[in-house]
Amino acid sequence: MNQSYGRLVSRAAIAATAMASLLLLIKIFAWWYTGSVSILAALVDSLVDIGASLTNLLVVRYSLQPADDNHSFGHGKAESLAALAQSMFISGSALFLFLTGIQHLISPTPMNDPGVGIIVTIVALVCTILLVSFQRWVVRRTQSQAVRADMLHYQSDVMMNGAILLALALSWYGWHSADALFALGIGIYILYSALRMGYEAVQSLLDRALPDDERQEIIDIVTSWPGVSGAHDLRTRQSGPTRFIQIHLEMEDSLPLVQAHMVADQVEQAILRRFPGSDVIIHQDPCSVVPREGKRFELS
């Protein structure tokens, strides 16, 4: 795992924690001043943001540790655990918002000075957009699952702040139920995002295979290589930033062992050029012993 990856994901986690802390202080004041249930929803979400981002920061640092005697495949799965923990945090906040929205829908209460809430929400919206932009850039560079989960979380915050702006504006014009209705809608959306995030984390923990397009690229690299007659038993998974790739190459029976080994090394390097940092295991099989049943990839 290269130093650039560790530096970027750590900075993304620190930035998220710092931003969530700043927004929490701003929203506490805004809620105290206006009494808006939508701002209360945003405040609770910021509390969850801090917990999730702190968890993310600690777990990311752990996941960056190199492989050791007890964890020979590294610590990358800790990122999936962080994403799963975040989904639980977010689900809890969504339930709280939903219940609070119902309570205020039954007994709507006019808020004080919605203008202050609007200003605070605009500030929160701008700050969150800046954070999401930075996280998206980090995800493109690292493919970190933990940072991607955090980014999805803050993307939902962008939509939430937009909805809060609209709710505050409507409340300013006398429609006090709008505040509670938007809190309900925000809670439903956040719950959906949490469930989706949790599903992706569980799939990673269950060693889901790499995406179809990446597997096809691996097959194309292998089967187009000189000296390779075909391939079978491709197995893939991902742990943190590391892809694990296993495949059997089919070679002519008459090919000397040393030459077969050289071809396998060349194929491995070709895969690593396309997927840097991967853990690649290649086994060579003579064509005469390859079973004709099962998953095979032959030359076209």
From Swiss-Prot:
Residues recorded as binding Zn(2+), renumbered to this chain, are D45, D49, H153, D157
Q: Name one GO cellular component term.
A: plasma membrane
- Specify the superkingdom: Bacteria
* SUPFAM superfamilies named in the record: Cation efflux protein cytoplasmic domain-like (SSF160240), Cation efflux protein transmembrane domain-like (SSF161111)
Task: List where the protein spans the membrane.
Answer: 12-32, 39-59, 82-102, 114-134, 151-171, 172-192
Q: Which UniProt keywords apply?
A: Cell inner membrane, Cell membrane, Ion transport, Iron, Iron transport, Membrane, Metal-binding, Transmembrane, Transmembrane helix, Transport, Zinc, Zinc transport
Q: What InterPro entries does the annotation carry? A: Cation_efflux (IPR002524), Cation_efflux_CTD (IPR027470), Cation_efflux_CTD_sf (IPR036837), Cation_efflux_FieF (IPR023783), Cation_efflux_TMD_sf (IPR027469), CDF_Transporter (IPR050291)
Q: Does the keyword Heme apply?
A: no
GO BP term, example:
intracellular zinc ion homeostasis
Which catalytic reaction applies to this protein?
Zn(2+)(in) + H(+)(out) = Zn(2+)(out) + H(+)(in); Cd(2+)(in) + H(+)(out) = Cd(2+)(out) + H(+)(in); Fe(2+)(in) + H(+)(out) = Fe(2+)(out) + H(+)(in)
Regarding the membrane, this protein is recorded as: Multi-pass membrane protein
Q: Which GO terms describe its molecular function?
A: cadmium ion transmembrane transporter activity; ferrous iron transmembrane transporter activity; metal ion binding; zinc efflux antiporter activity
Task: Tell where it localizes.
Answer: Cell inner membrane
Cross-referenced HAMAP family: Cation_efflux_FieF
Task: Provide the family line.
Answer: Belongs to the cation diffusion facilitator (CDF) transporter (TC 2.A.4) family. FieF subfamily.
Q: What does this protein do?
A: Divalent metal cation transporter which exports Zn(2+), Cd(2+) and possibly Fe(2+). May be involved in zinc and iron detoxification by efflux.
Its assembly, as annotated, is: Homodimer.
What NCBIfam families is this protein classified in? CDF, PRK09509.1
Q: Could you tell me what this protein is called?
A: Cation-efflux pump FieF
Q: Which species is this record about?
A: Escherichia fergusonii (strain ATCC 35469 / DSM 13698 / CCUG 18766 / IAM 14443 / JCM 21226 / LMG 7866 / NBRC 102419 / NCTC 12128 / CDC 0568-73)
Upper taxonomic lineage: Bacteria, Pseudomonadati, Pseudomonadota, Gammaproteobacteria, Enterobacterales
